[in-house]
């Protein structure tokens, strides 16, 4: 009989070293496969204006169900291993929103209304505790649980449950948990997990200047995500505007020595300046005499304000693209390339976005 350090059993990789390293690596690979599957589905099927909503549903139904299979019973799960799973999750969220790689993590979850992987594992683990306690005391699963309670081994499943209860402020004994229904306990756990996650989002917000205007008092999708009056392209644009990752120089100061606008050269290139930039707004007749009244902060306003301002930004960005192509077409071939900072009218791209989510509408 051949000896092996790893063996797959019921979907998990069991290691002779007692770690989850091989299992987590396998789940990350499965997660990447699920992302490819979701991308394929979303590009082959015409989803129109509901592309983002359906992408988030597929994230829950396909990606999460595959990557977290059996996660409620994983032991010795480290912070690093959870972070590895969350990195894969954020790849999917960024693709769905066509978000920049520098988008603050808190924006990905706050505007989609989704819990992170750590929170989802905590819910599953605590609900599995309720399942164990609901079984007869003579059953093997219940006896193993009671035995672990008497031991003091770091990384035991019981130790992770105790940590979850402390972190989420769930002050309930096993007897208390046994005395409530599954629905009641699940409702309590979800409430506690969401409250803790919102607290974590607000803690991250305090560390990032791009999240200055982020408001997260309740974990639910931002209204613009679900509003059918906005097409997918404009929803993704509004997300970039809100998270300060639109392709303008001041959003990426570290990669631009010259902050002046490459369209007019009159002011620093900010999201707010685009609304006033003469070469970009002069051809938009409906903005004549009104640019001074435009408020960039409407991207954080109510849905009516958001629809109005994102449509204006969309038109301005189209003008910027036209200006860029006109300049390129006017450069004689013999002159060779011209550096963007040397001429007004050249638009310097500060960064490369992730692959665009292709959807009709």
What is the meaning of each model-derived region?
Residues 1-3, 99, 257-262:
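Short, hydrophobic/aliphatic alpha-helical segments
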Residues 4, 106, 264-266:
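A generic hydrophobic-helix recognition signal that picks specific residues
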Residues 6-143, 148:
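Non-catalytic, peripheral interaction segments enriched in hydrophobic/basic residues
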Residues 34, 156-159, 293:
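Surface polyanion/phosphate-binding segment centered on an Asp-His-Pro turn
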Residues 40-48, 204-207, 211-361:
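Family-specific functional microsites
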Residues 60, 88-89, 100-245, 249, ...:
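Extended C-terminal regions of large enzymes
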């Amino acid at each position: 009989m051949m000896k092996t350090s790893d063996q797959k059993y019921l979907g998990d990789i069991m290691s002779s070293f007692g770690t989850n390293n091989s299992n987590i690596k396998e789940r990350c690979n499965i997660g990447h496969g699920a992302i490819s599957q979701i991308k394929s589905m979303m590009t082959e099927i015409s989803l129109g204006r509901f592309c983002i909503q359906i992408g988030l549903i597929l994230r829950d139904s396909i990606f999460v169900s595959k990557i977290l299979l059996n996660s409620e019973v994983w032991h010795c799960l480290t912070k690093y291993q959870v972070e590895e799973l969350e990195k894969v999750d954020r790849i999917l969220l960024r693709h769905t929103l066509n978000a920049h790689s520098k988008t603050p993590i808190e924006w990905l979850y706050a505007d989609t209304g989704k819990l992170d992987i750590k929170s989802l594992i905590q819910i599953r683990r605590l609900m599995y505790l309720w399942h164990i306690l609901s079984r007869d005391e003579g059953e093997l699963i219940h006896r193993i649980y009671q035995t672990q309670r008497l031991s003091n081994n770091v990384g035991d499943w019981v130790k992770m449950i105790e940590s979850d209860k402390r972190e989420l402020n769930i002050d309930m004994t096993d007897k208390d948990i046994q005395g409530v229904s599954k629905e009641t306990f699940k409702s309590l756990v979800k409430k506690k997990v969401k409250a803790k996650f919102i607290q974590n989002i607000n803690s991250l917000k305090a560390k990032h200047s791009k999240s200055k205007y982020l408001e997260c008092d309740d974990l639910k999708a931002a209204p613009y995500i679900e509003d059918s009056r906005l097409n997918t392209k404009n929803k993704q644009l509004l997300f970039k505007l809100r998270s300060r990752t639109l392709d303008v120089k001041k959003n990426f100061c570290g990669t631009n020595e010259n902050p002046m606008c490459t369209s007019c050269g009159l002011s620093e290139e900010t999201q707010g300046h685009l609304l006033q930039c003469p070469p970009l707004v002069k051809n938009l007749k409906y903005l004549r005499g009104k640019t001074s009244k435009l408020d960039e902060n409407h991207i954080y306003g109510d849905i009516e304000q958001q629809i109005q301002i994102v449509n204006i930004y969309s038109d301005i960005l189209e003008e910027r693209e036209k200006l860029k192509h006109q300049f390129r077409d006017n450069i004689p071939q013999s002159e060779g390339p011209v550096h963007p900072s040397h001429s007004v009218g050249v638009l310097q791209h500060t960064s490369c976005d992730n692959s665009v989510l292709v959807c009709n509408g």
